[in-house]
Amino acid sequence: MVNIGGNIIALGQHGTQPWRVGIQHPRKPDAIATLDLPSGWAIGTSGDYQRYFELKGTRYCHIINPATGYPVQGVQSVTVLISPQPNAGVLSDVTSKPIFISQPDARAAMAKQMEVKDYLVIESDTKILASASMTKRLNWLDKQAEKHVVETH
C-alpha cells in the first residue's frame, strides 16, 4: 500500500485480505468509516481540514474555486474510489477536486461526467452524499454520520 497524503493505492494485499483503510472524519480525529481496498484500487480525499486558516470564525481551505477565485465553502471532504486501471492513483487525486469545487446540486453530475462511480461527499451542514456503490463498500464507524447519508445515483 502506498499512501501519499490524501491518496492511497493498494499494491497487493495485507496477507490474505485486502487492505482496510479509514476515511478521516473532517471534524474529528477519528475515521468516519472504513472500506476494503483491493489490490490495484486507489482512494483519494480532498478536504478543508488539513490545510486551512480561520478568520473571524470562517474556515478558508487551500482549495480555490477557479470560478470565484475564493476558497471553496460548503463542503468538508470528498472521497473517491477508483477501480484498477492505468494511473488509478493519479485519477484518485484529480477527480476528487472537481467534485469538491462543484456546487452542492452538481456534485453527483460532476462525478458521473468524470466516470467516478464510488464517491462520498461530506457537506458543511453534516449532510452526506454517497453513490449507491460507495455506500455498499463502507463500514460506518460514526453511526451518527451514517444517519445523514443521502444516496445518489
Model-derived regions: residue spans:
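Mature catalytic core of soluble alpha/beta enzymes
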Residues: 1-153
